[in-house]
């Protein structure tokens, strides 16, 4: 079976069974294939550019401030401070005594914020004197006598409230 058989004078097939490239329909098919290849290249290039743009850092936007998280005390009843800020303040406030921690159970951590925004943290224990705690706060943040007395009375109220619960 040869495709190059001569079928008569009306048919114009070339020997070898090849397509007649001079025909307009074949030119249209080839042009369509080339256009499709060019389009695919453009789409792939655009996808690569878009992927590169995604990896660039986004402009910084203001974030929400850190939320205060409740940290419960340890079940074993230990007096380890749960707030790292309080640990530093307790070390500095108890530097005058020979013990590292006063005897007794830790009741709460007092955070005093001054008008300047500076926060002073002091751990208050069960056996603490409210006057001593207010002096420890005023050592870090200067307080006038009226403010010191108001702080002492507030510490006294908080101590009484917490000692009555336990």
Curated annotation (Swiss-Prot):
Pfam families linked to this entry: UPF0561
Annotated spans, Disordered: 32-107
Feature: compositional bias, Basic and acidic residues: 32-49
Compositional bias per record (Low complexity), positions renumbered to this chain: 91-101
Domain of life of the source: Eukaryota
Family: Belongs to the UPF0561 family.
Protein name, as recorded: UPF0561 protein C2orf68 homolog
């Amino acid at each position: 079976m040869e495709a190059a058989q001569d079928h008569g004078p009306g048919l114009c097939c070339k020997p070898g069974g090849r397509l007649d490239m001079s025909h307009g329909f074949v030119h249209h098919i080839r042009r369509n294939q080339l256009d499709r290849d060019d389009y695919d290249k453009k789409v792939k290039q655009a996808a690569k550019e878009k992927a590169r743009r995604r990896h660039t850092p986004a402009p910084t936007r203001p974030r929400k401030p850190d939320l205060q998280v409740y940290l419960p005390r340890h079940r074993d009843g230990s007096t380890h401070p749960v707030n790292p800020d309080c640990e530093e303040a307790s070390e500095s406030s108890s530097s005058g005594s020979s013990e590292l921690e006063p005897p007794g159970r830790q009741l709460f951590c007092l955070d005093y914020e001054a008008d300047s925004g500076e926060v002073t943290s002091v751990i208050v224990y069960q056996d603490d004197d409210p006057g001593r705690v207010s002096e420890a706060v005023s050592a870090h943040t200067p307080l006038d006598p009226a403010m010191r007395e108001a702080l002492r009375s507030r510490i006294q109220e908080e101590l009484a409230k917490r000692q009555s619960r336990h």
